[in-house]
Amino acid sequence: VSYNPGTSVKMNPVFASFWIQKITNIPSIFTLSTNDLNIQAIEGLLLGAQSLGLNNVVFVMGDLPSRAISTTKVLEFTKKMNQGLDINNDKVSYATSFCIGSTIDISKDWDHEIVLTKRKIDSGSDFFIAQAQFDIARVVRFLESYRNVTGTHIDIPILWGVQMLAKGSGSFTNIPDNIKFDLENGKPGFDIALDIIDQYFSYGITSFYLLPSFFKTGRRDYLSAGKLISTLT
Protein backbone atom coordinates (compact mmCIF):
# COMPACT_ATOMS: atom_id res chain seq x y z
CA VAL A 1 0.00 0.00 0.00
CA SER A 2 1.60 3.25 -1.17
CA TYR A 3 2.21 6.25 1.06
CA ASN A 4 -0.04 9.08 -0.22
CA PRO A 5 0.57 8.49 -3.95
CA GLY A 6 -0.05 11.49 -6.19
CA THR A 7 -1.12 14.88 -4.87
CA SER A 8 -4.30 14.02 -3.00
CA VAL A 9 -4.55 12.91 0.62
CA LYS A 10 -5.17 9.19 1.07
CA MET A 11 -5.85 6.93 4.04
CA ASN A 12 -2.77 6.24 6.13
CA PRO A 13 -1.19 3.08 4.65
CA VAL A 14 -1.05 1.37 8.05
CA PHE A 15 -4.83 1.48 8.38
CA ALA A 16 -5.39 0.69 4.70
CA SER A 17 -3.10 -2.34 4.98
CA PHE A 18 -4.89 -3.52 8.11
CA TRP A 19 -8.25 -3.28 6.33
CA ILE A 20 -6.98 -5.14 3.25
CA GLN A 21 -5.36 -7.86 5.33
CA LYS A 22 -8.49 -8.29 7.47
CA ILE A 23 -10.81 -8.53 4.45
CA THR A 24 -8.62 -10.75 2.26
CA ASN A 25 -6.68 -12.71 4.88
CA ILE A 26 -3.59 -12.09 2.71
CA PRO A 27 -0.48 -10.53 4.33
CA SER A 28 -0.22 -6.88 3.36
CA ILE A 29 2.77 -4.57 2.89
CA PHE A 30 2.53 -0.93 3.92
CA THR A 31 4.83 1.91 2.92
CA LEU A 32 6.20 4.76 5.04
CA SER A 33 7.96 7.85 3.72
CA THR A 34 10.94 9.02 5.75
CA ASN A 35 10.53 12.69 4.77
CA ASP A 36 7.13 13.21 6.42
CA LEU A 37 7.83 11.65 9.81
CA ASN A 38 10.41 11.97 12.56
CA ILE A 39 11.99 8.96 14.21
CA GLN A 40 9.58 8.89 17.17
CA ALA A 41 6.58 9.06 14.84
CA ILE A 42 7.92 6.19 12.75
CA GLU A 43 8.60 4.09 15.84
CA GLY A 44 5.09 4.78 17.13
CA LEU A 45 3.50 3.82 13.81
CA LEU A 46 5.54 0.63 13.68
CA LEU A 47 4.45 -0.41 17.17
CA GLY A 48 0.84 0.32 16.25
CA ALA A 49 1.12 -1.58 12.98
CA GLN A 50 2.59 -4.57 14.75
CA SER A 51 -0.27 -4.57 17.28
CA LEU A 52 -2.68 -4.78 14.32
CA GLY A 53 -0.91 -7.86 12.98
CA LEU A 54 1.01 -6.13 10.18
CA ASN A 55 4.49 -7.56 9.67
CA ASN A 56 5.69 -6.15 6.33
CA VAL A 57 6.88 -2.57 5.77
CA VAL A 58 8.69 -0.73 2.97
CA PHE A 59 10.55 2.52 3.57
CA VAL A 60 10.85 5.14 0.82
CA MET A 61 12.69 8.45 0.82
CA GLY A 62 9.80 10.46 -0.66
CA ASP A 63 9.85 13.55 -2.84
CA LEU A 64 11.84 15.81 -0.49
CA PRO A 65 15.05 13.91 0.32
CA SER A 66 16.67 16.99 1.90
CA ARG A 67 14.08 16.74 4.71
CA ALA A 68 14.13 12.98 5.03
CA ILE A 69 15.76 10.66 7.51
CA SER A 70 18.08 8.43 5.51
CA THR A 71 16.57 5.10 4.55
CA THR A 72 19.59 3.25 5.88
CA LYS A 73 19.13 4.85 9.30
CA VAL A 74 15.45 3.85 9.38
CA LEU A 75 16.36 0.31 8.37
CA GLU A 76 18.89 0.14 11.19
CA PHE A 77 16.56 1.31 13.94
CA THR A 78 13.70 -0.86 12.70
CA LYS A 79 16.02 -3.85 12.99
CA LYS A 80 16.73 -2.71 16.57
CA MET A 81 12.98 -2.60 17.23
CA ASN A 82 12.86 -6.24 16.13
CA GLN A 83 15.30 -6.82 18.99
CA GLY A 84 13.09 -4.90 21.44
CA LEU A 85 15.08 -1.66 21.48
CA ASP A 86 14.44 1.87 20.23
CA ILE A 87 16.97 4.14 18.55
CA ASN A 88 18.40 5.11 21.97
CA ASN A 89 18.78 1.45 23.00
CA ASP A 90 15.92 1.79 25.49
CA LYS A 91 13.44 -1.07 25.66
CA VAL A 92 10.24 -0.62 23.64
CA SER A 93 6.84 -1.93 24.75
CA TYR A 94 7.45 -5.17 22.87
CA ALA A 95 9.86 -6.46 20.26
CA THR A 96 8.52 -6.21 16.73
CA SER A 97 8.95 -8.83 14.01
CA PHE A 98 8.93 -6.84 10.81
CA CYS A 99 10.06 -8.03 7.42
CA ILE A 100 11.66 -4.76 6.30
CA GLY A 101 11.78 -3.59 2.70
CA SER A 102 13.33 -0.71 0.81
CA THR A 103 13.54 0.38 -2.82
CA ILE A 104 15.82 0.13 -5.85
CA ASP A 105 15.62 2.70 -8.64
CA ILE A 106 17.67 1.62 -11.67
CA SER A 107 16.66 4.76 -13.58
CA LYS A 108 19.20 6.68 -11.47
CA ASP A 109 22.99 6.74 -11.73
CA TRP A 110 24.06 3.12 -11.34
CA ASP A 111 27.35 3.87 -9.57
CA HIS A 112 25.41 5.59 -6.78
CA GLU A 113 22.49 3.16 -6.81
CA ILE A 114 24.74 0.10 -6.52
CA VAL A 115 26.54 1.57 -3.49
CA LEU A 116 23.21 2.56 -1.91
CA THR A 117 21.71 -0.87 -2.58
CA LYS A 118 24.66 -2.54 -0.82
CA ARG A 119 24.30 -0.15 2.13
CA LYS A 120 20.59 -0.94 2.41
CA ILE A 121 21.34 -4.66 2.54
CA ASP A 122 24.03 -4.10 5.17
CA SER A 123 21.59 -1.92 7.16
CA GLY A 124 19.02 -4.68 7.38
CA SER A 125 16.76 -4.61 4.32
CA ASP A 126 15.04 -7.99 3.96
CA PHE A 127 13.69 -7.36 0.46
CA PHE A 128 13.53 -4.71 -2.26
CA ILE A 129 10.74 -3.22 -4.33
CA ALA A 130 11.78 -1.80 -7.70
CA GLN A 131 9.96 0.55 -10.04
CA ALA A 132 8.15 -0.78 -13.09
CA GLN A 133 10.43 -1.67 -15.99
CA PHE A 134 9.73 -2.22 -19.67
CA ASP A 135 13.31 -3.13 -20.71
CA ILE A 136 13.99 -6.34 -18.82
CA ALA A 137 17.47 -6.69 -20.33
CA ARG A 138 18.31 -3.47 -18.47
CA VAL A 139 17.24 -5.12 -15.21
CA VAL A 140 19.64 -7.98 -15.91
CA ARG A 141 22.47 -5.57 -16.75
CA PHE A 142 21.95 -3.78 -13.44
CA LEU A 143 22.12 -7.05 -11.51
CA GLU A 144 25.30 -7.99 -13.39
CA SER A 145 26.82 -4.56 -12.68
CA TYR A 146 26.00 -4.94 -8.99
CA ARG A 147 27.78 -8.29 -8.91
CA ASN A 148 30.81 -6.91 -10.78
CA VAL A 149 31.15 -3.90 -8.45
CA THR A 150 30.45 -5.58 -5.10
CA GLY A 151 31.64 -9.10 -5.82
CA THR A 152 28.35 -10.53 -4.55
CA HIS A 153 24.84 -11.20 -5.80
CA ILE A 154 21.83 -9.41 -4.36
CA ASP A 155 20.79 -12.29 -2.14
CA ILE A 156 17.47 -10.91 -0.87
CA PRO A 157 14.20 -10.94 -2.85
CA ILE A 158 13.50 -8.14 -5.34
CA LEU A 159 9.91 -7.46 -6.41
CA TRP A 160 10.09 -5.88 -9.87
CA GLY A 161 7.20 -3.69 -10.98
CA VAL A 162 5.03 -4.53 -13.98
CA GLN A 163 3.02 -1.51 -15.13
CA MET A 164 -0.26 -2.45 -16.79
CA LEU A 165 -1.27 -0.10 -19.59
CA ALA A 166 -4.39 0.92 -21.47
CA LYS A 167 -5.17 3.63 -24.00
CA GLY A 168 -5.10 6.94 -22.16
CA SER A 169 -3.51 5.53 -19.02
CA GLY A 170 -0.42 6.91 -17.31
CA SER A 171 2.89 5.41 -16.30
CA PHE A 172 5.42 6.20 -13.57
CA THR A 173 8.25 5.35 -15.97
CA ASN A 174 8.89 6.19 -19.62
CA ILE A 175 7.07 3.92 -22.06
CA PRO A 176 9.26 2.75 -24.98
CA ASP A 177 8.12 3.77 -28.45
CA ASN A 178 7.55 0.18 -29.57
CA ILE A 179 5.13 -0.43 -26.69
CA LYS A 180 3.35 2.88 -27.38
CA PHE A 181 3.00 1.79 -31.01
CA ASP A 182 1.55 -1.59 -30.04
CA LEU A 183 -0.89 0.03 -27.62
CA GLU A 184 -2.08 2.64 -30.11
CA ASN A 185 -2.55 -0.04 -32.75
CA GLY A 186 -4.88 -2.12 -30.64
CA LYS A 187 -2.68 -4.51 -28.70
CA PRO A 188 -4.35 -4.99 -25.31
CA GLY A 189 -2.44 -3.77 -22.28
CA PHE A 190 -3.16 -7.17 -20.74
CA ASP A 191 -1.09 -8.85 -23.47
CA ILE A 192 1.70 -6.28 -23.14
CA ALA A 193 1.94 -7.02 -19.41
CA LEU A 194 2.06 -10.77 -20.13
CA ASP A 195 4.89 -10.18 -22.62
CA ILE A 196 6.86 -8.27 -19.97
CA ILE A 197 6.33 -11.05 -17.43
CA ASP A 198 7.42 -13.65 -20.01
CA GLN A 199 10.64 -11.65 -20.47
CA TYR A 200 11.23 -11.76 -16.72
CA PHE A 201 10.65 -15.52 -16.74
CA SER A 202 13.11 -15.95 -19.63
CA TYR A 203 15.83 -14.45 -17.42
CA GLY A 204 14.86 -16.58 -14.43
CA ILE A 205 13.21 -13.69 -12.56
CA THR A 206 9.96 -14.76 -10.91
CA SER A 207 9.21 -12.07 -8.30
CA PHE A 208 7.22 -9.01 -9.31
CA TYR A 209 4.16 -6.95 -8.45
CA LEU A 210 1.49 -5.39 -10.65
CA LEU A 211 0.63 -1.72 -10.98
CA PRO A 212 -2.92 -1.50 -12.38
CA SER A 213 -3.40 0.94 -15.24
CA PHE A 214 -4.41 4.36 -13.91
CA PHE A 215 -6.05 7.41 -15.43
CA LYS A 216 -6.19 11.17 -14.88
CA THR A 217 -9.58 10.79 -13.20
CA GLY A 218 -7.91 8.68 -10.50
CA ARG A 219 -9.55 5.47 -11.69
CA ARG A 220 -7.44 2.31 -11.54
CA ASP A 221 -8.24 -0.84 -13.46
CA TYR A 222 -8.05 -3.40 -10.68
CA LEU A 223 -10.25 -5.85 -12.59
CA SER A 224 -7.63 -6.31 -15.33
CA ALA A 225 -4.93 -6.72 -12.70
CA GLY A 226 -7.01 -9.40 -10.99
CA LYS A 227 -7.55 -11.16 -14.31
CA LEU A 228 -3.80 -11.15 -14.96
CA ILE A 229 -3.09 -12.61 -11.52
CA SER A 230 -5.65 -15.36 -12.17
CA THR A 231 -4.02 -16.10 -15.54
CA LEU A 232 -0.59 -16.44 -13.95
CA THR A 233 -1.75 -18.60 -11.07
List the predicted regions and their residue ranges:
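Active-site mouth loops of central-metabolism enzymes
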Residues: P27-Q40, F98-H112, D177-I192
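C-terminal extensions of enzymes
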Residues: L194-L232
